[in-house]
Swiss-Prot record:
Coiled coil: none annotated. This is High-affinity zinc uptake system membrane protein ZnuB. It is a multi-pass membrane protein. PANTHER family: ABC-TRANSPORTER METAL-BINDING PROTEIN, HIGH-AFFINITY ZINC UPTAKE SYSTEM MEMBRANE PROTEIN ZNUB. Keywords: Cell inner membrane, Cell membrane, Ion transport, Membrane, Transmembrane, Transmembrane helix, Transport, Zinc, Zinc transport. InterPro entries: ABC_BtuC-like (IPR037294), ABC_TroCD (IPR001626). The gene is znuB. SUPFAM superfamilies: ABC transporter involved in vitamin B12 uptake, BtuC.
């Protein structure tokens, strides 16, 4: 059993190094719907990958990056609010993905693996690819950390300091899109956003500084992954949703902590 769980455990711990800090920005900037839009659009990536006979997860990465770029452009060049655009894109892509899968008559598609993840099927090859992606995202995040933080805390002050706010928003969206694509096999399209927001929301109850919030979020994420895999192993439950349940449980426990005066 340990041999089966170990690659999944290692992958989850590696992913938490980027889902936690990016989740902090998602919570601060109230971007949860952006994450949902990209994750729900992943089904279209699966359908296109199968149709074009390429690895569906590669198709998901490419599609989420294209959608992130498109959303940045649409937000700046149309009169619609970002929530309206996200709603249109999310439901259009999800519906188009379902219809496209339905048209693939000669191909059997196990949607459950893509919707809720296939965590226990992760192997060391997957871990290598995910690890490379994590290094890229984490390195970029560390390099732009101060600028991203400044534009999040006080956009006006950041602009005075000469920071390009649109560029930072674009970078954050691209990093979030790549993180969601990398995490898709871990927990699936429908619940991937929970890996971003729940540990970050829990960490907010304990942190005093942005950096400490990231640290707490990483700890909460790792605890959720370990607890979820143990729950899955003992009770034969779906691994991805089990991780989310543990994460939600930690959040509920954090609500009993008294607020600082």
């Amino acid at each position: 059993m340990f041999e089966i769980l170990f690659p999944a455990l290692l992958t989850g711990i590696v992913l938490s190094l980027i889902t936690a800090p990016l989740g902090v920005f998602v919570v601060w900037r109230k971007m949860a719907y952006f994450g949902d839009t990209l994750s729900h659009s992943a089904l279209l990536g699966v359908a296109l990958g199968i149709f074009l006979q390429v690895n569906p997860y590669i198709a998901i990465v490419v599609l989420t990056l294209i959608l992130a770029i498109a959303m940045v452009w649409l937000e700046s060049n149309t009169q619609f609010s970002i929530d309206t655009l996200l709603g249109i894109i999310a439901h259009s892509c999800l519906s188009l993905g379902v219809v496209t899968v339905g048209l693939l008559r000669n191909v059997r598609v196990d949607l459950m693996n893509y919707l809720f993840g296939d965590l226990l099927a992760i192997n060391y090859t997957d871990l290598i690819y995910i690890g490379i992606g994590v290094i890229i995202v984490l390195s970029t995040l560390i390099y732009f950390w101060q600028s991203l933080l400044s534009t999040t805390v006080s956009p006006e002050l950041a602009q005075v300091e000469g920071i390009n706010i649109k560029k930072m928003r674009f970078i954050l969206m691209i990093l979030t899109a790549l993180t969601i694509a990398l995490s898709m096999k871990f927990v699936g399209a429908l619940i991937i956003t929970s890996l971003l927001i729940i540990p970050a929301a829990t960490a907010r109850r304990f942190a005093r500084t942005p950096e400490s919030m990231v640290g707490w979020a990483i700890i909460m994420s790792m605890l959720s992954i370990i607890g979820g895999l143990i729950l899955s192993a003992f009770y034969d439950t779906a691994a991805g949703p089990s991780v989310v349940i543990c994460s939600a449980f930690l959040f509920v426990l954090s609500l009993f902590k008294r607020e600082r005066l």
